[in-house]
């Protein structure tokens, strides 16, 4: 998928989270360690969300692309975010899978995996 398609998937997941009373605090957060697609509060837990948008599963499930290396970069980036914002709170790493025939597909489906990795 293109960057524009990925951005569309991230916006879709942001709306999904808002609809479930999450409070979004960052979108496409970047630092020297990497990027986190979405950062949101779920009650008193700060969630770091990786979004994967796909049109099919021929090459595997989207969650399978959150490799051990990607997880390590996400953890480092999250630690930097917590430190730079002086936060000491419960955290969670979630993965959101967006399935859509094409970007903008009104039939798009989101599979949201809470606590997808530690």
Where are each of the predicted segments found?
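Short acidic/glycine-enriched loop/turn segments that link adjacent beta-strands
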Residues: 32-34
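Basic, glycine-rich
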Residues: 29-30, 100
